[in-house]
Amino acid sequence: MLEFYGKRFESRLLLGTAQYPSPSILADAVRASLSRIVTVSLRRESGEARAGQDFWALIKALGVAVLPNTAGCHTPREAITTAHMAREVFGTNWIKLEVIGDTDTLQPDPFGLVEAARILCDEGFEVFPYMNDDLIVAERLIEAGCKVLMPWGAPIGSGRGLNNPYALKTMRAHFPDIPLVVDAGIGVPSHAAAAMELGFDAVLINTAVAKAGDPAAMARAFALAVEAGRLAYEADPIEARDMASPSTPLLGKAFL
């Protein structure tokens, strides 16, 4: 069972709530995904007062845990301010911390991220940092107080999948007891399954579901892929080989 900061969840799929064609389609996708955690941007929630209230009512009606994020923040100060606002609005100490360093790739700023994480952890937040796949950055975030890490698979919204599976596999081996979530870049369910097969605890999906032709069907596909990938990891899959290895025994086989 998935566990973040002492809270346990049956689903290992986290779902973002942005970019859906309509609120009803979002609700259908969340239900189809079986996800028990959704991410919410404070900027989206706070747009128009009535629209924000309707959106928040929809999320509460779904009965899911809310993970607010600091999407769009480019400095530690901006991210920290947004985190405090999110805690007031959503009534949770959880925060998905994003400090963007590059506007083209939306790559996280590792220095600003660690700085903001340290301050927020000291202030009682339970931080989910969106990061690259660098082990040293991961070490610093853990030292800052983070008990979850969210390395990217590829740039946000790119749909490229796992750009560097070697780095992700190394991170899993290096931090066997830290919950790891692949966040960003997942495009199709097979990408999610691959992440789970590496031993990651969960994946976070947004664009791949929200922008699909049928978001609810795609959400269900991702739910199945995540489950399949986790089962495969727990089943201890065989190692890849360079040479063939016969699967059919030769004993009793006729030789002509």
Swiss-Prot record:
Keyword Magnesium: no
Record's catalysed reaction(s): [ThiS sulfur-carrier protein]-C-terminal-Gly-aminoethanethioate + 2-iminoacetate + 1-deoxy-D-xylulose 5-phosphate = [ThiS sulfur-carrier protein]-C-terminal Gly-Gly + 2-[(2R,5Z)-2-carboxy-4-methylthiazol-5(2H)-ylidene]ethyl phosphate + 2 H2O + H(+)
Active site (UniProt): 96
Gene Ontology cellular-component annotations: cytoplasm
Gene Ontology MF annotations: thiazole synthase activity
Pathway(s) of this molecule: Cofactor biosynthesis; thiamine diphosphate biosynthesis
Organism superkingdom: Bacteria
Binding positions for 1-deoxy-D-xylulose 5-phosphate per the UniProt entry: 157, 184-185, 206-207
GO-annotated biological processes: thiamine diphosphate biosynthetic process
Keywords for the protein's UniProt record, in alphabetical order: Cytoplasm, Schiff base, Thiamine biosynthesis, Transferase
Annotated InterPro entries: Aldolase_TIM (IPR013785), Thiazole_synthase_ThiG (IPR033983), ThiG (IPR008867)
Subcellular localization: Cytoplasm
EC number of this enzyme: 2.8.1.10
Family per record: Belongs to the ThiG family.
HAMAP family: ThiG (MF_00443)
Function description: Catalyzes the rearrangement of 1-deoxy-D-xylulose 5-phosphate (DXP) to produce the thiazole phosphate moiety of thiamine. Sulfur is provided by the thiocarboxylate moiety of the carrier protein ThiS. In vitro, sulfur can be provided by H(2)S.
Assembly information from the UniProt record: Homotetramer. Forms heterodimers with either ThiH or ThiS.
The protein, known as: Thiazole synthase
Provenance organism: Brucella abortus (strain 2308)
